[in-house]
A protein has these predicted regions:
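Short, small-residue-biased leader/transition segments that mark boundaries at the very start
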Residues: 1-3, 7-14
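Short, glycine-/Ser/Thr-/acidic-enriched flexible segments
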Residues: 6-8, 26, 33, 57-59, ...
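Active-site loops and adjacent core secondary-structure elements that bind or stabilize anionic groups
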Residues: 11, 112-338, 342, 363, ...
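Cofactor-cradling patches in redox/metallo enzymes
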Residues: 18-24, 28-100
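Generic, well-ordered alpha-helical scaffold segments in large soluble proteins
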Residues: 19-24, 43, 47, 68-75, ...
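Conserved phosphate-handling catalytic cores of large alpha/beta enzymes
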Residues: 68, 72-80, 85-145
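Amphipathic alpha-helical packing elements
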Residues: 72-94, 180-216, 447, 452, ...
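C-terminal accessory domains/tails appended to large, multi-domain proteins
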Residues: 290-298, 303-475
Length: 475
């Protein structure tokens, strides 16, 4: 028997791996999400587990995985440890996790690999050769990581700031929103959001790679993709009819100005009271002919004397999703339990797309005549961006807290942030709205110690805290 528990931080697709293993006669103990290390290890002992599995969706999960590995070593565990989830990689497992635990630590890239890995680890004849091969692979991964040179040279924070994106604030008038303040969208019908669904990531979540709609005609996976597409649409039909899932969202548009790499948000147009400071990070590698981008560059600097504004949003496509998934599981229908999660994830993303369009055309109103097809929306052929904390342009997750505080998200629509700043329900999107026509997405990528210190100071964090939250952007 394999007793596998899910990691103590939220993960989407948490049931995929379990389903695949159960179908191959492994017994699974799924502890759910946000479970402490102590509970994981205590349960593993109680049930006589053969393997422990951890899965993580967002970057803070990575630190927790390291902590679990260290605790397993300290407490003398002899079980293999499986690592998986969206934020994990073979390199991270080899460099950060594996060296903290004497027993096998194996990165599982997808659910389909899990059975072979588990069988190899539990078969006394297969295990020695399998573990030796993994050890060799990790040694190579660590060596490659150590020798990896950044593609471009790092520069000091002062140098990066001197090379900021210089926008013409003299000849440009930032558009004033038609509707300032916070607005709630308590129950947007599924029928409104369906046309905004981007289906390509849906197929990817089922490990079917291909662009929609071409994937439906694919010689190899077209038939499977078509069946899955039909099932997803049947589920959407059902959600439209029975209204068992609620899609709720909230937006806010506020007076704001840039101050260095931060953005001040004001209580009203007098701009005398700062209600929140948003902290951003700047690219810190040498750029040939390009600026060192930072999101704060896209809001008029305070010293320009130009009034500007910023938006914030949070949406979920999954209020009620958990109960439906649990009901399917209780009925031993794992396929539909996973399908409802995948469909609600798509609804959340569609909601973010729909609401951003409404903001551009109506609430902020700087593009009232915009008329784009869904394909054009997916390609982002519009003015402005909606970067999300935790993603490359603003990779630090605790900034979600500012969105929650500015909008009163939890009180208004019930969406919560966990201790690791993951969003609940899991089918959720949150972020910022920038209106500047030159605003664009970019990756902050690797930053240097001087920026970490500066960020810690701006955020009121200790250096250790800042290093923890900025971990993926440090060498």
């Amino acid at each position: 028997d394999l007793h596998r528990r899910r990691h103590s931080f939220p993960t989407r697709r948490s049931s995929d791996l379990g389903v695949v293993l159960q179908c191959n006669n492994f017994e699974i103990v799924d502890l759910g999400v946000m479970v402490s290390c102590e509970t994981i290890l205590k349960t593993a002992r109680e049930v006589g587990a053969d393997i422990i599995g951890l899965s993580g969706l967002i970057t803070p999960s990575l630190d927790e995985m390291v902590h679990v590995a260290k605790e397993m070593e300290r407490q003398g565990f002899k079980l293999p440890l499986l690592i998986g989830g969206a934020t994990t990689s073979k390199a991270h497992t080899a460099v950060k996790i594996e060296q903290n635990y004497s027993e096998p630590v194996v990165y599982v890239s997808n659910a389909s690999r899990a059975v072979g890995v588990a069988q190899s680890l539990l078969n006394p004849e297969l295990k020695p050769a399998f573990v030796a091969r993994i050890d060799k692979e990790y040694e190579i991964a660590r060596d490659q990581h150590a020798r990896k040179q950044p593609r471009s040279k790092p520069v000091s924070l002062a140098h990066a700031r001197a090379n900021r994106h210089q926008l013409d604030w003299v000849g440009y008038e930032p558009p004033k929103p038609r509707e300032l303040g916070v607005q709630t969208f308590e129950d947007v019908p599924v029928s409104v959001l369906r046309p905004y669904i981007d289906w390509t990531p849906f197929f990817l979540s089922w490990e079917l790679a291909g662009k929609y709609p071409r994937i439906l005609e694919d010689e190899i996976i077209g038939e499977e993709a078509t069946k899955l597409f039909a099932d997803a649409n049947a589920m959407l039909d059902q959600l439209e009819q029975d209204k068992s899932v609620r899609c709720a969202g909230i937006i806010g548009l506020f007076p704001a100005n840039g101050v260095g790499d931060s953005i001040e948000v004001y209580s009203d147009e007098s701009r005398t009271e700062v209600i929140k400071v948003l902290h951003h990070l700047r690219q810190q590698s040498e750029k040939q002919g390009f600026p060192n981008y930072c999101l704060a560059d896209y809001v008029a600097p305070k010293e320009s004397g130009k009034p500007d504004w910023i938006g914030a949003f949070a949406v979920t496509g999954g209020i009620g999703e958990e109960a439906i998934a649990q009901a399917y599981k209780a009925d031993h229908d794992d396929y539909n339990a996973i399908l409802i999660q995948a469909v609600c994830d798509r609804l959340a993303e569609a909601f973010a797309e729909y609401l951003h369009e409404q903001v551009r055309k109506v609430h902020w109103g700087y593009a009232p005549d915009e008329a784009l097809s869904n394909e054009e929306l997916i390609r982002e052929n519009y003015q402005g961006i909606r970067p999300a904390p935790g993603y490359p342009a603003c990779p630090e997750h605790t900034e979600k807290g500012s969105i929650w505080e500015l909008l009163g998200v939890e009180q208004a629509i019930g969406m919560k942030l966990t201790e690791s700043y993951a969003m609940w329900p899991g089918a959720a999107v949150s972020g910022w709205y920038f209106s500047h026509p030159e605003s664009k997405y970019f990756a902050v990528a690797q930053i240097q110690p001087d920026q970490v210190e500066d960020y810690a100071q701006r955020k009121g964090m200790t250096l250790v805290e800042a290093e923890r939250w900025l971990g993926p952007n440090l060498n």
